[in-house]
């Protein structure tokens, strides 16, 4: 009975693996471009997709781990265990990176996804939300990000922040049209 389930899980998992591999291949150069812009070319990022499927046929890997999986009560092998590995200078950002570097990675990945969507032909310019943008980032990175998104490539952007005094001069320096909305106790005002 488990053979049938595992065969199906492996067959569908391999399809997901292929789609993720193609997506990662497309995202990686965009991610590297945006991370380099955010860090002002001071750091060397890398992005790679790590999967059990890279070690051999997924069905055999899943079946080979069945005994251990039964003991612990869940599957240790399969597509659900895949990971998008992010490194800086060859070291995993998860273990070695600062909070600012980690946030820069996530923003670069978001910008890469945005770019990919924008050029996919399936949508016009997507709406971009940068939530709590300035938290954990130094002034240089914030400046790089705001200058980058202030151009015509990004369309409409929502930036949230908890400190209006910090936000106002940064936005004014872009010389772009913008509006600041205040949200206080659920009430929105200009």
Regions flagged by a language model, labelled:
Residues 2-127, 136, 140-156, 165-174, ...:
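Conserved NTPase motor "head" modules and their coupling/switch loops across ABC/AAA+ ATPases, GTPases
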Residues 131-133:
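Walker B catalytic acidic pair
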Residues 160-162:
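H-loop (His-switch) motif in ABC-type P-loop NTPases
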């Amino acid at each position: 009975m488990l053979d049938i389930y595992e065969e199906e899980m492996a067959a569908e998992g391999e399809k997901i693996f292929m789609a993720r591999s193609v997506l990662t291949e497309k995202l990686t150069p965009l991610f590297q471009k945006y991370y380099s812009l955010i860090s002002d070319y001071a750091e060397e990022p890398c992005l790679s997709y790590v999967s059990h499927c890279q070690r051999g046929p997924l069905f055999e890997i899943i079946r080979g781990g069945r005994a251990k999986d039964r003991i612990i009560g869940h599957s240790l092998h399969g597509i659900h265990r895949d990971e998008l590995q992010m490194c800086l200078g060859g070291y995993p950002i998860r273990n070695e990176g600062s909070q600012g570097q980690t946030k820069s990675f996530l923003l670069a990945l978001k910008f890469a996804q945005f770019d990919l969507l924008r050029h996919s032909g399936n949508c016009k310019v997507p709406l971009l939300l940068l939530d709590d943008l300035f938290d954990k980032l130094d002034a240089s990175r914030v400046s790089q990000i705001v200058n980058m998104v202030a151009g015509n490539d990004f369309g409409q952007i929502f930036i949230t922040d908890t400190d209006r005094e910090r936000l106002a001069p940064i936005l004014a320096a872009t010389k772009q049209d913008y509006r600041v909305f205040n949200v206080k106790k659920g009430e929105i005002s200009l």
